[in-house]
Amino acid sequence: MTLPQFPYLSQHEWRYFDDANHVPALPASDSLAYQDSFIRWLPHLQGDQAQGIVHFYSIDKPTVLLGAKDSRLPNLAAGLAYLEDQGFDYALRPHGGLGVVCDPGILNIGLASDLTHFPLSIDAAYEQMVALIGLSLMPYGLELEAYEIAQSYCPGTYDLVVGGQKIGGIAQRRFKTGLTTAAYISVAGDQAARAQLMAGFYQAAGADDSYPKVDPAVMTTLAHACGQPLDRRTYQEELIQLISHYQKLVPGDYQDPDLVPIFTKMRQVSLARTQSLKSEVNSKPDS
């Protein structure tokens, strides 16, 4: 397969971080703290060539990463209690307005870069991720589209769609000159159950019409779409090989002396975000 030019990938030197390899294992709040940290760390890395970060932060423990709008639900405590009853943890993420589900069948990937060295408009940044995922699906004979699936959870203009069904979504965060574009991909597992979980959460939390009315039928997994067995690790390796076609990936160092103090600070911010949710449940009158 002949691959097209991809300047965003080829014109960066990429550091590669995989939270699955971190010892000890990282909780969801720490993975989110690294998302916050990388866009602040990037200015320390820039040299003659633009520097970027590829961050895989898939979360095995069943977890819902809630968005800022979710935190304003009228009966948030009841919604969070519902998630707990279903065996799910939760955290408040720094990007994206609404919640997404994480489990062993979901792949999370972030691309972080510095706008000073590679300027991107908001739409253009989203389109880099769409292009990457689209190329990764070509060997499966799948064509990726990007448009909003309104009845999915966390609907957005750049929903990742195959055959009319959503397989993933993209969020974006900017801090000064730092940019992170993050995507989740439903690689395998029970996507209908994930959608039903989010529908139940919004119902329990008293969501009004400004929140999605989640319909499981509008979402699917990559494995179902391609009609063959596929797991998260296999698909992640395929993404790594694809990126490596354009530019070498260098293993990142979680203990980099410039990164550690940034992460230490951002970890406290991330923990505080999630603790604010936990306090909602603990403050319920019947708790």
What positions do the PLM features span?
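N-terminal lobe of the biotin/lipoate ligase/transferase fold
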Residues: 1-120
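Local beta-strand/beta-hairpin segments that build beta-sheet-rich folds
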Residues: 17, 167-168, 218, 222
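Short amphipathic alpha-helical segments
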Residues: 30, 34, 75, 121-132, ...
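Contiguous, small/hydrophobic- and glycine-enriched helical/loop subdomains that border
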Residues: 107-150
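Long, positively charged amphipathic alpha-helical accessory segments at protein N-termini or as interdomain linkers
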Residues: 140-142, 177-287
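Beta-rich nucleic-acid/ligand-interaction surfaces
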Residues: 146-167
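Aromatic/basic-lined ligand-recognition segments
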Residues: 164-172, 180
